[in-house]
């Protein structure tokens, strides 16, 4: 994998960044495009060679296994690829950096238990933190500029974050923070200011003393990725966060993490992504598609596109199936089907969030056969008032959103759509949907082209 990964991505996705797809791409049945996307996503294959971390010095007895795991990964990579096997037991480790052609495989009852010491997450690495590029702590499992990489098996990744470690950096009392303790806010504001002013990446250095939490899994500028079968718990921040990646499969994972910003799976400026048969139980959005934040996201200019999500289950979280708020590079061609969402602690089922600083286009988004039990606020929320709200010069373009055979048993609102007068939400279609036990009328601020076909709310047909 050469160092011109971004050039490759920009060349391959210029149509997504610079303009909408031609109408000919979208057939009468848009779901044929979803089938075409799935057909071309190919999980990586690996030679049948195993590299057991025990043979490289790892011990499931509390011994630090960081170096042993790194030696096994290097040997596997040097041999041309294979599986680095984590056998049964609990293995203490600092961040793990994957290399090309390596499948890190956790057998059932294997646990990777990650260090709580921030110093172990140095040296600084390239990352995107809340949609802005910088140099910061490594993710717990990290890769940059690699291809043919995987994280598989029935084992568990334990992030070891709690209200005494990592989560207090959020700066909220319900996350263990108290007045007088440091938190992320000064560094977060500084990073966003650097992004707005085009400060060179090499000068955007954070890490020690800045309190910007790492993610659990972050693969950057890489391709041909598989994450399958594993369970993830208690991440410092996002659980799965591919950034500027292509040909990504996330399958059969289980995520349980109720800390701040512990999103389940957040593809950021990624293309050709399949997420299926996963279970999300989180402290933030279960699944959020992103594409960079504000000016920095527009500078990078790579959309998230050609994403299929199916057969997933969402429990607790702020949003079940979410796009944004970091979406300045654009999000398009998203297909969601046969998913279940249900929890009194799930706020929004289908959630879009942006504002007048983000800009960006969200278009060609399709939901079908989505079953929602109980949700706290709204079945469909499109919110232009998120965070900065109207305090900015940009005009988000959000439209061409379609719901078919979506049902809900209980929610405060069916629709909560808040656009801008200068940039209305447009072209939203609901077909054959049933929403029961809805408590309040729809909120429709600056919406154009809303069409409801055979939609029932509390047993009554709505037009």
Located regions from the model:
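Extracellular/periplasmic carbohydrate-active domains that bind, remodel
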Residues: 2-463
């Amino acid at each position: 994998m050469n160092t011109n990964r971004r050039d490759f991505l920009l060349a391959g996705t210029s149509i997504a960044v610079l303009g909408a797809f031609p109408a000919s791409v979208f057939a009468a049945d848009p779901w044929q495009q979803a089938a075409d996307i799935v057909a071309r996503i190919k999980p990586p294959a690996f030679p049948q060679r195993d590299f057991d971390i025990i043979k490289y010095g790892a011990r499931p007895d509390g011994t630090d296994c960081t170096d042993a795991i790194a030696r096994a990964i290097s040997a596997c990579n040097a041999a041309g690829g294979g599986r680095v096997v984590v056998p049964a037991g609990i293995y203490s480790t600092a961040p793990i950096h994957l290399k090309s052609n390596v499948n890190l495989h956790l057998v059932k009852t294997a646990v990777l238990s990650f260090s709580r010491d921030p110093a172990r997450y140095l040296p600084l690495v390239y990352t995107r933190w809340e949609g802005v590029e910088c140099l910061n702590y490594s993710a717990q499992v990290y890769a940059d500029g690699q291809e043919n990489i995987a994280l598989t098996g029935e084992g568990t990744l334990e992030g070891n974050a709690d209200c005494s470690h990592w989560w207090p950096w959020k700066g909220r009392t319900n996350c263990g923070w108290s007045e007088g303790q440091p938190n992320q806010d000064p560094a977060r504001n500084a990073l966003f200011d650097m992004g707005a002013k085009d400060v060179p990446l090499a000068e955007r250095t954070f890490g020690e003393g800045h309190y910007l939490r790492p993610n659990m899994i972050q693969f950057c500028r890489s391709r041909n990725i598989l994450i399958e079968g594993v369970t993830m718990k208690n991440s410092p921040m996002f659980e799965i966060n591919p950034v500027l990646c292509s040909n990504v499969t996330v399958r059969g994972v289980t995520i349980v993490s109720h800390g701040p910003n512990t999103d389940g799976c957040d593809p950021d400026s990624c293309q050709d992504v399949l997420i299926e048969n996963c279970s999300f139980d989180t402290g933030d959005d279960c699944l959020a598609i992103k594409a960079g934040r504000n000016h920095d996201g527009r500078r990078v200019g790579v959309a998230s596109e050609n994403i299929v999500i199916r057969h997933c289950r969402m429990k607790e979280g702020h949003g079940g199936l979410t796009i944004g708020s970091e979406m300045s590079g654009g999000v398009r061609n998203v297909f969601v089907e046969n998913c279940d969402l249900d929890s009194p602690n799930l706020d929004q089922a289908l959630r879009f969030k942006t504002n007048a600083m983000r800009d960006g286009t969200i278009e060609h988004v399709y939901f079908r056969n989505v079953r929602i039990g109980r949700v706290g606020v709204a079945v469909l929320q499109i919110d232009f008032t998120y965070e900065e709200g109207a305090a900015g010069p940009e005009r988000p373009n959000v439209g061409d959103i379609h719901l078919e055979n979506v049902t809900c048993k209980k929610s405060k609102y069916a629709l909560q759509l808040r656009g801008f007068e200068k940039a209305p939400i447009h072209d939203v279609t609901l077909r054959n949907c049933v929403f029961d036990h809805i408590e309040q009328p729809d909120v429709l601020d600056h919406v154009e082209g809303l069409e409801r076909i055979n939609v029932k709310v509390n047993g009554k047909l709505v037009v």
